[in-house]
Amino acid sequence: MAAEPTARLSLLSDLTPPSLERTWLTAPHPTLPIVATCSSDKTVRVYSLTNFRLLSTISGGHKRSVRTCAWKPHVKGESVLATGSFDATVGIWRRWDSYGQTERGAADWGVGDSAGSGTQAKGLADGYGAGGDEENENEDEDEEWRFAVLLDGHDSEVKSVSWSPSGMLLATCSRDKSIWIWEDLDDGDNNFETVAVMQEHQGDVKCVAWHPAEDCLASASYDDTIRLWREDLDDWGQVACIKGHQGTVWCVDWEGVDSVPCGAAADLAEQWRATHALSGPRLVSCSDDRTVRIWRRQPKEPRAQQNTSPFGSSGIPSIIRPTGTDETWEEECTLPQAHDLSVYTVAWSKRTGLLASVGADGRIVVYAERFVGGDSATQAMETEPSADAAEGAPAPSTEWTVIATMDGAHDIYEINHVAWAKRADRGKAEGEDEEVLVTTADDGGVKVWTIAR
């Protein structure tokens, strides 16, 4: 019998005004208290997380629904947004972040991205009306979004876009079964160069997501597979094809680099980090088969780990493509069954390690991983110890449990997307690093939720 939820989801606010048409996805800015929402009305709506009001409407760049968007990381002085549309194009938008000072501020907003992120957040909160009524300035705000460049290459609807950790590479995927990787030349002229086109998927590619610390890309597809891609000697190629889902894989997301399960004592947390250092961050996926699954990379042999140079041990360049680039990924666990219909999005919090999933049943589900003892009652959902655990110590056992659910979160409508964001409104507890959940649905609405544990 499933355990009773131990946390509570509560509606904090709707983002207003909502779109009058279906909304697909909401992307929180990496350093500022704003989000961008993609809509079927061909626009992207930018909302404040300080007062939950519409700040800008980005329009004019696409001829059909805007399906996806992503903020470029590590940009100083401006915000850069990539948008993907059903018109088969990708747009790049820019806007200067010069908004003056604020009384309240959000100096702690940044998540270790840049030294100036706190000042940037404070200026934005003020200029975007943190606690004030600035709606009459919306028209001026709109004009400040500059449509920088249109990336044309896909033959069909663009389903997902994702920036690499450095912000230099942009991955896009499409119904045309291809994945494109573009390099931002950062030359001041908004020039992008096509780095790779990968066509190994045998169906519509639904999602692309970059590893949080490496230039490794994960993709999810209508062909029921997840694939991993890396660059080797200037040539991008597939290094793993993960099979396990019995239906379309809608979404993949990565674990945070320093994520540790809930309730960890210092020594246990250190043991966890040591035993997971070789395999790196895990991957989570969700599917038409109604499951949410976690995958872990098998560590390579120590010699392969040490000799990663394309020049080999001699230091002399080799004209032969090195072997051993393939990776082995295994299913670590399937999370407790909590959805009745297709699961469209799963999001892994980089701050808390919590997982959230949403889908066609209109339900929000939040999961937590915790350390457990070795008794047989907890073995069903436990992760397997790593055979290559550091210093021979076994990996601590964990299990995933559902800690909160919300049925009918958007009334009768399907929920298309969920994301974690840092809380920025006045109700935030002083000194607390709180997170909120942001859900995006077919009703055109975007809702912000708190989770009390």
Swiss-Prot record:
Listed Low complexity bias regions: 309-319
Superkingdom of the source species: Eukaryota
Biased composition (Acidic residues): 132-142
Gene3D superfamilies in the record: YVTN repeat-like/Quinoprotein amine dehydrogenase
Family matches, as InterPro entries: CIAO1/Cia1, G-protein_beta_WD-40_rep, WD40/YVTN_repeat-like_dom_sf, WD40_repeat_dom_sf, WD40_rpt
Entry's Gene Ontology cellular component terms: cytosolic [4Fe-4S] assembly targeting complex
SUPFAM superfamilies from the UniProt entry: WD40 repeat-like
Start and stop residues of the WD repeats: 15-57, 61-103, 153-192, 200-239, 244-305, 338-377, 409-450
Keywords on record: Repeat, WD repeat
Region (Disordered): 107-142, 300-319
GO biological process: iron-sulfur cluster assembly
Transmembrane segments: none
Recorded family membership: Belongs to the WD repeat CIA1 family.
Function statement: Essential component of the cytosolic iron-sulfur (Fe/S) protein assembly machinery. Required for the maturation of extramitochondrial Fe/S proteins.
Protein name as it appears in the record: Probable cytosolic iron-sulfur protein assembly protein 1
